[in-house]
Amino acid sequence: MLSFFKTLSTKRSAWFLLFSSALLLEAIALYFQHGMGLAPCVMCIYERVAILGIAFSGLLGLLYPSSMLLRLVALLIGLSSAIKGLMISITHLDLQLYPAPWKQCSAVAEFPETLPLDQWFPALFLPSGSCSEVTWQFLGFSMVQWIVVIFALYTLLLALIFISQVKRLKPKQRRLFH
């Protein structure tokens, strides 16, 4: 199984799939915000940034997937983004499932001073919604429950691929004649 993931990580198509799936999730989030009028909360914005980290890792791996160093850097970025996104989305889910006056998220995104995404790109990163409010459901699950599943899948997949990097692939036997 690990050799399958190792081989997969050396193919551009796998990295393109990671990149495009994360971009698709970003596009869906923007449709929910601008098309359906659902206001994103601070946690939603942080989850978007984590998805962008996964997209960046996919783009990085897409550049030169046969380089072990670049693959490891891309996997570390993607895995740390997926884990951070999972942690944020679980906290967000806790706010939705067990709302209380003393458990509220901030009304303002707290980005570093050197990277104020909410000021540079307010249409993408300016929060205006409530973290504890459930505004959309699909198949009985809220958007946050779906994003927890998505981040868990990204974390599992990227962890397996990262672990598989220590596995040596069998060298291809080149035969001149069959």
From Swiss-Prot:
User: What are the disulfide bonds?
Assistant: C41-C44, C105-C131
Q: What is its main location?
A: membrane
What protein name applies here? Disulfide bond formation protein B
**Transmembrane intervals:** 15-31, 50-65, 73-90, 146-164
Give the source's domain of life in one word. Bacteria
Localization, per the record, is: Cell inner membrane
Q: Which family does it belong to?
A: Belongs to the DsbB family.
List the Periplasmic topological domains.
Answer: 32-49, 91-145
What residue ranges lie in the Cytoplasmic compartment? 1-14, 66-72, 165-177
Pfam families associated with the record:
DsbB
What are the protein's GO molecular function terms? Answer: electron transfer activity; protein-disulfide reductase activity
Keywords, sorted A to Z? Cell inner membrane, Cell membrane, Chaperone, Disulfide bond, Electron transport, Membrane, Oxidoreductase, Redox-active center, Transmembrane, Transmembrane helix, Transport
Provide the Gene Ontology terms for cellular component: plasma membrane
**Gene Ontology annotations of biological process type:** protein folding
Explain the purpose of this protein.
Required for disulfide bond formation in some periplasmic proteins. Acts by oxidizing the DsbA protein.
Query: How does this protein sit in the membrane?
Result: Multi-pass membrane protein
InterPro entries per the UniProt record, alphabetical: DiS_bond_form_DsbB/BdbC, Disulphide_bond_form_DsbB, DsbB, DsbB-like_sf
